[in-house]
């Protein structure tokens, strides 16, 4: 777990370093940070797989929801209280705001878990616009097609079209 955590931390750190290098006008350095970050992701995946940490999607959604619940209900709440006690009110507010985001993440994962359990991931119950994530084909119906009639990708590539613009 330590190797996985270390590689994961390094990946994020190098990604942030890349953004700073790019902002400072160092494209080559930014690209090398990103290349190294991707290497670190690959290393993290090796250790993650050895840990057997990725189960079935239902199990992963349950784990993700539990992790998000812990973050908003315990971790960020405790961090906010400690920051406030130490006089860092601005940081306490950030912890509370991030906690609210984590609560929304938990809701999202629980909704997705319910959809998987109820076999509703690719069904809407009413006519909907399903978009192929590979080629953009639009299918109108209560369920996504088994395969895209344009590019042949399986149902897994379809999602209900989000028109939030």
What role is predicted for each listed range?
Residues 1-165:
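Non-heme di-metal
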């Amino acid at each position: 777990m330590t190797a996985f955590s270390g590689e994961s931390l390094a990946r994020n750190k190098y990604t942030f370093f890349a953004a700073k290098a790019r902002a400072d006008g160092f494209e080559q350095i930014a690209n090398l940070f990103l290349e190294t970050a991707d290497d670190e992701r690959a290393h993290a995946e090796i250790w993650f797989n050895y840990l057997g940490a990725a189960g079935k999607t239902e199990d992963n959604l349950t784990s993700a929801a539990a992790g998000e619940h812990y973050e908003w209900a315990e971790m960020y709440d405790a961090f906010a209280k400690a920051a406030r006690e130490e006089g860092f009110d601005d940081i306490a507010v950030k912890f509370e705001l991030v906690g609210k985001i984590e609560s929304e993440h938990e809701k999202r994962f629980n909704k997705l878990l319910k959809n998987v359990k109820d076999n509703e991931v690719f069904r809407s119950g009413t006519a909907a616009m399903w978009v192929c994530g590979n080629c953009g084909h639009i299918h109108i119906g209560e369920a996504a097609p088994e395969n895209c009639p344009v590019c042949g990708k399986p149902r897994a590539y379809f999602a209900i079209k989000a028109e939030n613009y």
